Design a protein with these regions (language model features):
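Compositionally biased, intrinsically disordered linkers/stalks adjacent to structured regions
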Residues: 157-190
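Extracytoplasmic/secreted envelope proteins and their assembly/folding machinery
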Residues: 52, 56, 60, 86, ...
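Sec-dependent bacterial lipoprotein signal peptides
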Residues: 1-14
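A structural "domain/chain start" motif
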Residues: 14-68, 73-76, 154, 183-190
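Conserved acidic
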Residues: 47, 51, 116, 166, ...
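Surface-exposed short loop/turn segments
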Residues: 67-70, 75-166
Length: 190
């Protein structure tokens, strides 16, 4: 029993540099005098309607989980404002296959290439401002592959609608992944 107690004492007293964070662990924000942040509506500079909503939702989630910070509903109640812009939201073909390989009856042309995979890309920039002064800013870009619906000659095929739906879902996931980078940069968690 004494060995067990000594072992536990050694384990707890020898620190490896990791510790649980508390809500008071926000030295960077304390230095700036920031505890409450207003998130401005995200600006959309792309031709992709609605992408700013996914980014805004993920930004609110990220800020809500950041120790020492609290999101507020009006700029008057805030110590600082987080401003964001979406500069790129697109999908590109990242995998192709011959149309004749997709149809068992070989109705498709062997010369016609059909997308079998896309890559969703998202680029955003953010800035934390206080009374017109920029406290922090950063630009972020993330991508993620997603499968394409490549049915050829199928009656009632809704390939375009399915691809569009998958793209929307992938953009939401990319935005969530991007917020990990934003939070790390904002809080300097390395």
């Amino acid at each position: 029993m004494l060995c067990f107690i000594q072992g536990m004492f050694l384990i707890t007293s020898s620190s490896c540099g990791y510790a649980l964070r508390t809500s008071k662990d926000a030295p960077r924000f304390s230095q700036w005098g920031v505890r409450r942040v207003y998130i401005r509506p995200i600006q959309n500079e792309t031709f992709r309607a609605g992408v700013e909503n996914s980014v805004y939702t993920q930004t609110v989630r990220m800020l809500s989980s950041t120790p020492g910070l609290r999101s507020v509903n009006s700029p008057e109640d805030a110590d600082a404002e987080l401003v964001g812009t979406v500069s790129l939201a697109q999908r590109t073909v990242s995998g192709e296959t011959k149309a004749s390989d997709l149809n068992p009856k070989n109705l498709g042309s062997p010369l016609l290439l059909v997308a079998s995979e896309y890559t969703a890309s998202l680029a955003c920039s953010f800035a934390l401002t206080q009374k017109g002064k920029i406290l922090w800013s950063g630009e972020f870009r993330r991508s993620r592959p997603f499968p394409a619906n490549s049915q050829v000659g199928a009656l009632g095929s809704t390939g375009a609608l399915i691809n569009e739906s998958e793209f929307e879902r992938a953009l939401g996931e990319v935005a969530a992944d991007m917020m990990v980078d934003v939070r790390s940069s904002l809080t300097q968690d390395f």
